[in-house]
Amino acid sequence: VTSEPGARLDDLVLHLAALAGTPTLFNPYADTDPTVDGSDAPAIRRGNLGRYLRAFMDRDEIDLWLGEAPSRFGARRTGVPFSGEGYLADLSSRLAIAPFGIATDEALATRPSSTSRQIWSALPARLPLFWNAVMHHPHRVGTPLRNRTPTRSEITRHREALTLLIAAIRPRRILAIGRVAEGAAAGYDVPITYVRHPAQGGAAQFRAGVAEFGRDAS
């Protein structure tokens, strides 16, 4: 059994890559989208996620911000939750790590999702760790760039990844962004705070919830 934290994080990335995708669930760590990806895109995304996770390895009092699933313009393309290509340079700078790789061949998604814009605008100075209840991109049949809510069975299949993450990182608190994330976060010995998901008119409530979450830490 692997016990060293860095090796456990590497195992986590490999675990996500080994989880098979489906016709409506794109695995960014193993699968290639021929319309936008370079041939080595899955390896780049695995490298991005591994580098991102290792940046938190020696940090104390980490807050975990848990979302629902990747968006079409976020981790589906980059491998890093809540982070499309347009945020990668800022993220690597704030984490003081080497630049992330670009896995796609075209620049469409310098355009962020509305959810990621709200999340990035609400970030505290001390960065939280981003994760999703489902780390593969759920989409509709025949429309790979149309987001959908993950199913209960998909969340269950990805629970082991969340368990591995929590064991390796040991977050002090979880900010659950939306009810799907709140349900996925249950059952761990980590305090959970629910905030309204910023989509579909929830932006103001989301910002207020994040602000209160930040005050509770002080």
Model-derived features with residue positions:
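A polyanion-binding, active-site-adjacent surface
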Residues: 3-175, 181-188, 193, 200
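Short, charged, surface-exposed secondary-structure boundary motifs
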Residues: 140, 200-211
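A polyampholytic, Gly/Pro-enriched intrinsically disordered region
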Residues: 212-218
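Polar low-complexity intrinsically disordered regions
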Residues: 1-4, 218
